[in-house]
A protein has these predicted regions:
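Histidine-centered catalytic micro-motifs
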Residues: 124-134, 209-217, 278-282
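Cap/insert and terminal regions of metallo-dependent hydrolase folds
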Residues: 74, 88-109, 217-305
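Active-site metal-binding loops of divalent metal-dependent hydrolases
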Residues: 21-22, 70-73, 129, 151, ...
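Active-site metal-binding motif and surrounding structural segment of the metallo-beta-lactamase
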Residues: 81-147
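Core dinuclear metal-dependent hydrolase active-site scaffold
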Residues: 16-18, 49, 55-60, 66, ...
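Metallo-beta-lactamase
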Residues: 1-120, 149-208, 228-234, 254-273
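Acidic, His- and aromatic-enriched active-site or binding-groove loops in soluble protein domains
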Residues: 145-154, 301-305
Length: 305
């Protein structure tokens, strides 16, 4: 079976790259669910994974740059008040993740390291609104910020921090938000997905709803005739091989995670050359490099000190 082809024989995408705005250690049960309630393992485990990248995917189009996610803000490791500190919520944040971000690992610096100017970013797609995906927002006041309407609605709930959304780091003045709602589609190249959002109307960048990690999580399919199709998966999985074997991440709504995992796995089975690129998979850079896109990777696995 051939790869999913964009409906128009055009070539709007010139290059795809990945940069890393630091690393994050998380709990092993976060990567792969053991079936134990999340609050239990989060409060009792002493184990951490090794450093995992905080990936930002960079799509160079004929008209400028598009980002998928924006990384982690360095203020999260320099400002003691960045995360909630009191009560159960503060304890959960302290036990959930630990970050390493060097001074040269801002979004602006990472883009410059591969020859790009952040001023050329005209659109940033956010897979969801957790801190390790929204860290570059303050550097992108000139760009359209695209996210699922459901994710945007979560920000207006009474206690979004309980869902991992820190309003004070998201709802910044001067940002150009563009919430979208995937609509029914009949494109056979997107099956089994029945709803999608074509970002520019040319079929090259298509947003797919993959709820579970958060209710409004999105993935993005990059497709162009003659090129390896790419699926930027956010936190739908932390390891492609675990997803292929049907294993779920440890945080999120399990039924929705399971449905999204099945949909992504079905898409992958139909198109074996599909390169799936999660946000924190250490092998994602190598997988992209091995694709027909090649790429320029600036990913730090050993944090600079």
């Amino acid at each position: 079976m051939t790869s999913p082809a964009a409906p128009h024989d055009r070539h709007p995408v010139r290059a795809v790259s990945v940069v890393s705005t630091g690393t994050v250690d998380i709990r092993p049960q976060h990567v792969r669910s053991t079936g134990t309630p999340a609050l239990w393992w989060l409060m009792t485990t002493r184990r951490w994974t090794g450093p995992r990248p905080i990936n930002v995917y960079v799509i160079e189009r004929n008209d400028g740059l598009v980002l998928f996610d924006t990384g982690q803000d360095r203020a999260s490791v320099t400002d003691p008040g960045y995360f909630p500190r009191s009560g159960l919520t503060g304890l959960i944040y302290r036990r959930l993740a630990r970050f390493e971000i060097a001074p040269d690992q801002t979004l602006t610096a990472r883009l410059a390291a591969i020859g790009y100017d952040i001023a050329d970013v005209h659109t940033a797609v956010l897979s969801h609104l957790h801190t390790d995906h929204i860290g570059g927002l303050a550097e992108l006041r000139h760009a359209d910020l695209v996210l699922h309407q459901r994710e945007w609605d979560t920000l207006s709930e009474p206690r979004p921090e309980a869902s991992g959304l820190l309003r004070e780091h998201i709802d910044l003045p001067g940002l150009r938000w563009r919430p979208v709602t995937p609509q029914p589609v009949t494109d056979p190249g997107l099956a089994p997905f029945t709803a999608a959002h074509d970002l520019f109307g040319d079929g090259s960048l298509v947003l797919l709803p993959t709820p579970g990690h958060t209710p409004g999580s999105l993935s993005m399919l990059v497709r162009q005739p003659g090129a390896t199709p790419l699926l930027m998966a956010g936190d739908a999985t932390f390891d492609v091989h675990l997803m292929q074997d049907g294993h779920l991440p440890g945080l999120g709504e399990r039924a929705a995670l399971r449905a999204s995992t099945r949909a992504l796995s079905t898409l992958w089975a139909r198109y074996p050359d599909l390169a799936i690129l999660p946000a924190h998979d250490p092998a994602a850079g190598m997988r992209l490099s091995a694709s027909s896109w090649g790429q320029r990777t600036v990913a730090v696995t050993e944090p600079q000190r």
